[in-house]
Amino acid sequence: MTAAQFTNVTVNAQATISYDGRCSSHTIMFEDGRHKTLGVILPCDNLVEHYHFSTNTSERIEITSGECEVKINGEEEFSYYRAGQSFVVEGNSGFNLRTEQIVQYICHLEG
């Protein structure tokens, strides 16, 4: 279930920006030590067919708006996800993501 807002958190004001500004995220830290990132991904186009993201720890990516296709390392096909859905990527892995619209997400760092 998507949270509309988070309370009692510290936010890293410096964004993580990749793909020439097409992808950006901010880390939020909870009092109990948990971390999440909140991010925005802009649509792919003729310059960027898909984005590739690497993971250091297990992550659950929750799509909060938009829709996209995701192919986790080792999978043969892309899978479709839309707002309200999520997917899990193991640590020390990665995934490709392609989209034709703006996607917003919450990355739950689970490792």
Curated annotation (Swiss-Prot):
Entry-linked HAMAP family: Nucleos_phosphorylase_PpnP (MF_01537)
Catalytic activity annotation: a purine D-ribonucleoside + phosphate = a purine nucleobase + alpha-D-ribose 1-phosphate; adenosine + phosphate = alpha-D-ribose 1-phosphate + adenine; cytidine + phosphate = cytosine + alpha-D-ribose 1-phosphate; guanosine + phosphate = alpha-D-ribose 1-phosphate + guanine
Protein name as annotated: Pyrimidine/purine nucleoside phosphorylase 1
Protein's job: Catalyzes the phosphorolysis of diverse nucleosides, yielding D-ribose 1-phosphate and the respective free bases. Can use uridine, adenosine, guanosine, cytidine, thymidine, inosine and xanthosine as substrates. Also catalyzes the reverse reactions.
Entry GO terms, CC: cytosol
Molecular functions (GO terms): guanosine phosphorylase activity; purine-nucleoside phosphorylase activity; thymidine phosphorylase activity; uridine phosphorylase activity
Origin species: Psychrobacter cryohalolentis (strain ATCC BAA-1226 / DSM 17306 / VKM B-2378 / K5)
A Pfam family recorded for this sequence: Ppnp
Protein family (similarity comment): Belongs to the nucleoside phosphorylase PpnP family.
Keyword Cytoplasm included in the entry's annotation: no
EC number from the UniProt entry: 2.4.2.1, 2.4.2.2
Cross-referenced CDD domains: cupin_PpnP-like
Keyword Transferase among UniProt keywords: yes
Keyword vocabulary terms for this entry: Glycosyltransferase, Transferase
Gene assigned in the entry: ppnP1
